[in-house]
């Protein structure tokens, strides 16, 4: 464990993670300054921390303050390229991310899950397996509860953490027992200079792992396969397209687990989660517990009892023969592709939001094949309209509520309305969850035609 008493620590970013970091360092006797671009009045939930000696640097990041710190603890939403942070790095000030700081304090083995899509579902699936197995597991990270909160207890048997590329940018010694790379498609290109930089951030997950550790990788994702050919740890693959000699495979009806001379088969008809992408999530989630000795019947019962997460392809309502789905978590093109691919019948797609700089071309085939009406909202609407012009009927809406009204007008019985934005939410909402809640309320308020 690191020693922080008396050290001047600047926590950059006053979101949920930043507040957790501030509390962590205050509890250890550090002199803590919370630095944020917002004004002091705009910060919430800081009164208690202020009473315990937290100091503030508001309205921007003071370059001299950061350059004079003993340590900078950076929130994942703050790029290392922010001038004051970059200047401190150049001055030799150590800059560490939340997962690096937390991992140094935690003794329990960790499963760290990254990838472009499926991270949250896989993380929660594994947490459910651990719970049913009787193991005390912290489940969080980029999903929900920040990893730093796990340090408030020493009783964990396992740490199950969703990890983002942003979090991996500021690691040094971070080393999970199991590192999981679910898939790689274009995302966050508003933060990264290109796809190569994004992939490089994801691959940092494995850089401190050793032959004692295990990488769980998607054998069907060509970019994952190319990127993980030379890892310092063991590899266990999973595939939803074939049965593997070693690893987790799929024959179209059964998940087949082959490892160390053993074979187990699981019927996917038992699962509440639907769609091939969820078969992949289940396969990935099963691997670490089964390798650690969890009985197969307990693991399978756990995943079969899991019905999914909010705002991830959730059926909100059926009205006048139309099914309405909330997939507000679909914040990148790859996620929308998987959601559309799992739907039958004509689709009205509500998409748009804050553009992340990616390429919309991978959606073109499904837009032309399945989408009868595309209703666009938000900042990205112009780019998306240009990308899909001539492929389907395109409508524009000034708000999500207006988009729901338009969707009801144009979608006939037997059709599906899908909110799967392919963009982040921050141009119109505080989070994808708020966007999903607004959508659900608007759908529930619709009046049927009799």
UniProtKB/Swiss-Prot annotation:
Annotated PANTHER family: UDP-N-ACETYLMURAMOYLALANINE--D-GLUTAMATE LIGASE (PTHR43692:SF1)
EC class of the enzyme, as a word: ligase
Gene this chain is encoded by: murD
Catalytic activity: UDP-N-acetyl-alpha-D-muramoyl-L-alanine + D-glutamate + ATP = UDP-N-acetyl-alpha-D-muramoyl-L-alanyl-D-glutamate + ADP + phosphate + H(+)
EC number: 6.3.2.9
Binding annotation for ATP: 115-121
GO cellular component: cytoplasm
Lineage: Bacteria, Pseudomonadati, Thermodesulfobacteriota, Desulfuromonadia, Desulfuromonadales
Gene3D superfamilies documented for this protein: Mur ligase, C-terminal domain, Mur-like, catalytic domain, NAD(P)-binding Rossmann-like Domain
SUPFAM superfamilies: MurCD N-terminal domain, MurD-like peptide ligases, catalytic domain, MurD-like peptide ligases, peptide-binding domain
Cellular localisation: Cytoplasm
InterPro entries membership: Mur-like_cat_sf, Mur_ligase_C, Mur_ligase_C_dom_sf, Mur_ligase_cen, MurD
The protein's name: UDP-N-acetylmuramoylalanine--D-glutamate ligase
